[in-house]
């Protein structure tokens, strides 16, 4: 499966905070690293401190941990 920037994907990595959520592919690295796909989400995770809306809204995944929901418009 070849993912491209802008594709909507569902997360299949069970230990991920975003398991089952849908995110947008921000970039796909071609250099051969283990987790080449950066996915951006609408909400942040649990990182941050009390009273703050800060946190992380991106994560790296392998292509086999992602399911294509909607291809990006061309």
UniProtKB/Swiss-Prot annotation:
It comes from the Bacteria. Disulfide bonds: none annotated. The keyword Phosphoprotein does not apply. It is a peripheral membrane protein. InterPro entries: Elect_transpt_acc-like_dom_sf, PSI_PsaE. The keyword Protease does not apply. It is found in: Cellular thylakoid membrane. SUPFAM superfamilies: Electron transport accessory proteins (SSF50090). Stabilizes the interaction between PsaC and the PSI core, assists the docking of the ferredoxin to PSI and interacts with ferredoxin-NADP oxidoreductase. Belongs to the PsaE family. This is Photosystem I reaction center subunit IV. The gene is psaE.
